[in-house]
């Protein structure tokens, strides 16, 4: 199915507002398995809007118009579409009642005749109630082409799409089911290379790689009748993908860490800490508290995190954590010694089960003859103190700090998974 989005409003063309509705609608259509082929913006002009609707009707199966449903004369989307379809405008009873209720709480004089326009729908259409505003939307199919009219304000549009349009379209068309696989420790180019035969020959299910800062996701999607069939198809494909190895011979299953569009290494780690009733602390240098603030962003963080340390200078590392200053000077702050000492002292001082530390060179300049992006991450438990060295090259200072934090969460996550295997 080919869909087209038409944004109506002169303010979009003049740059007064950004058309965020287009991104939102495109994402929602993709989730439903509906391909958006065209996006058009047109001003508040009947002649030009008629021309755009005519063109869209010749090349698309689903035409979605957003904006121009308000009470003023330049709000002419429904009127113009009705004219194109040779349909009358009629009043929707529910929308009229909402207008009555709205103005009953205000001065009678505030209700003017033009407000009634917001309760109109195209004859024969399915009204789409507006939970957060007054302008009713609508859905109608004529000569095999479906048309949707939606309000322009994003808060009204999103509510109407999520609560009214998506359920309606799901009934009308086959549903697209998706599963998002998340990877850390492998780049997008390498992942695409080792999975090239799957990607090049894909039909159904489909595979869509996407790179984010420090990690990669794969969206697996299939169009099918129900969730059970989708789970079977996507599960089989997932097993095949994770059986592959990186160019270094590492199983992809080892760099896969979880599912979901909104998931993260931090969330996975937090949930494991809660699951096994473990507490954690951190001593941070180059990340300056980013690890701790990320952890504290989850509701219930106090179950696993009571506090930690931010020690930027060598002197503060010695003062706050009780590390020998002469040893720090000897080994340098960018070293395995310092990372391990910070992690262990943080654990001992707070009584946490796990101590993690981050020290290194955020950049852009070198430090202690170490290039920008050099990071040491320490991890201490009751039984072991260890560290890893990572090089995050060619990145901004902000990215180095963020990706270093991802490495720290991943290190803790792997430690907790080893604990899981011992239970």
UniProtKB/Swiss-Prot annotation:
Cysteine pairings via disulfide bonds = none
The record's family statement is:
Belongs to the CinA family.
* Designated gene of the protein: cinA
Q: What is this protein called?
A: Putative competence-damage inducible protein
Q: Which organism is it from?
A: Streptococcus pyogenes serotype M12 (strain MGAS2096)
- Which Pfam families does this one have? CinA, CinA_KH, MoCF_biosynth
Record InterPro entries? CinA (IPR050101), CinA-like_C (IPR036653), CinA_C (IPR008136), CinA_KH (IPR041424), Competence-induced_CinA (IPR008135), MoaB/Mog-like_dom_sf (IPR036425), MoaB/Mog_dom (IPR001453)
């Amino acid at each position: 199915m080919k869909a087209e989005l038409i944004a109506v409003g002169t303010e979009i063309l003049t740059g007064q507002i950004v058309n965020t509705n287009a991104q939102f609608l495109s994402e929602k259509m993709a989730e439903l398995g509906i391909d958006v082929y065209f996006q058009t913006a047109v001003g508040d002009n009947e002649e030009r809007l008629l021309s755009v609707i005519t063109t869209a009707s010749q090349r698309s199966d689903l035409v979605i118009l957003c904006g121009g449903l308000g009470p003023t004369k330049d709000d002419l989307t429904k009127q113009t579409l009705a004219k194109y379809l040779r349909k009358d405008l009629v009043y929707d009873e529910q929308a009229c009642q909402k207008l009555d209720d709205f103005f009953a709480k205000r001065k009678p004089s505030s209700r003017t005749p033009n407000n009634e326009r917001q309760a109109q729908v195209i004859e024969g259409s399915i009204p789409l109630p507006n939970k957060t505003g007054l302008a009713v939307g609508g859905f109608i199919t004529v000569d095999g082409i479906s048309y949707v009219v939606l309000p322009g304000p994003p808060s009204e549009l999103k509510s109407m799409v999520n609560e009214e349009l998506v359920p309606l379209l799901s009934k009308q068309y086959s549903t697209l089911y998706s599963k998002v696989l998340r990877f850390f420790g492998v780049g997008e180019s390498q992942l695409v290379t080792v999975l090239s035969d799957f990607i090049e020959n894909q039909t159904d299910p489909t595979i869509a790689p996407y790179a984010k800062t420090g990690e990669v996701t794969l969206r697996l999607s299939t169009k099918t009748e129900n969730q059970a069939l989708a789970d079977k198809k996507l599960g089989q494909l997932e097993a095949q993908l994770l059986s592959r190895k990186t160019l270094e011979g590492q199983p992809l299953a080892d760099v896969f860490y979880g599912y979901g569009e909104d998931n993260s290494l931090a969330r996975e780690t937090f949930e494991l800490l809660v699951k096994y009733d473990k507490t954690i602390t951190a001593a941070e240098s180059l990340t300056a508290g980013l690890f701790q603030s990320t952890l504290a962003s989850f509701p219930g963080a106090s179950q696993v995190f009571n506090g930690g340390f931010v020690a930027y200078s060598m002197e503060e590392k010695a003062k706050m954590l009780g590390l020998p200053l002469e040893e720090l000077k000897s080994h340098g702050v960018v070293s395995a010694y310092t990372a391990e000492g910070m992690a262990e002292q943080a654990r001992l001082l707070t009584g946490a089960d796990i101590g993690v530390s981050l020290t290194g060179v955020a950049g852009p300049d070198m430090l202690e003859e170490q290039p920008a992006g050099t990071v040491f991450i320490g991890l201490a438990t009751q039984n072991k103190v260890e560290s890893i060295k990572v090089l995050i090259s060619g990145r901004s200072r902000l990215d180095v700090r963020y990706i270093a934090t991802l490495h720290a969460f991943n290190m803790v996550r792997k430690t907790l998974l080893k604990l899981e295997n011992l239970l």
